[in-house]
C-alpha cells in the first residue's frame, strides 16, 4: 500500500519514513537521508457534535523535506525526554514557529472514514503550542544538536496543605 503512495508522490522511499512512523506509531519524527532533512509533525484536531454527543480526532501529519525555521516567538519551559536520555529535562521551546520547506505533504487521518488523504501543500507553515515544540525538537535532531536542558532531578517536592 505505501509503495504505491510513494510512487505517486514521486519521493524516495527513505523520505517517506517519518510520515509513515508518525501515522503508525504517533508523535513527531525526523530523519537525515543523505543530503535531505526530513521531518514529520503531527497536529490533532478534535471535532465533536454536541447534539449527537459523538466526535473524532482528526490527525494532520505534515511531512517536510529540508525544513527551515523562518521565525520563532515566545518561550515555553517544558519537560521533554528524548531517545538515549535517561530522564526528562527542562527545556526552552518557542510558543510559535513558522517554517518552510522545499517540499511538503499533508496527510489527514480520519478515524471515522478510515481514510488517509494526502496532498502536496505550500508554505510557509505556522505552528503554535505543542506543534511548535515538536518542530523545535525535531529541528534539533536534524541540525545534529543535542537536546540540552536542566536535569529533572533538580525539582523539589512540595506538599501543599
Regions found by a protein language model. Give the residues of each.
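Positively charged
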Residues: 1-161
Amino acid at each position: 500500500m505505501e509503495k504505491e503512495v510513494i510512487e505517486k508522490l514521486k519521493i524516495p522511499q527513505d523520505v517517506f519514513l517519518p510520515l509513515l512512523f508518525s501515522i503508525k506509531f504517533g508523535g513527531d519524527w525526523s530523519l537525515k537521508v543523505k543530503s535531505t532533512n526530513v521531518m514529520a509533525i503531527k497536529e490533532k484536531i478534535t471535532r465533536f457534535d454536541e447534539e449527537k454527543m459523538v466526535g473524532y480526532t482528526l490527525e494532520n501529519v505534515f511531512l517536510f523535506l529540508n525544513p527551515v525555521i523562518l521565525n520563532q516567538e515566545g518561550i515555553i519551559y517544558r519537560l521533554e525526554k528524548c531517545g538515549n536520555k535517561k530522564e526528562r529535562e527542562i527545556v526552552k521551546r518557542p510558543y510559535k514557529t513558522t517554517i518552510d520547506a522545499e517540499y511538503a505533504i499533508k496527510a489527514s487521518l480520519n478515524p471515522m472514514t478510515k481514510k488517509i488523504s494526502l496532498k502536496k501543500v505550500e508554505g510557509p507553515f505556522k505552528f503554535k503550542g505543542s506543534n511548535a515544540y515538536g518542530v523545535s525538537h525535531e529541528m534539533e535532531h536534524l541540525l545534529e544538536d543535542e537536546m540540552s536542558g536542566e536535569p529533572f532531578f533538580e525539582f523539589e517536592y512540595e506538599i501543599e496543605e
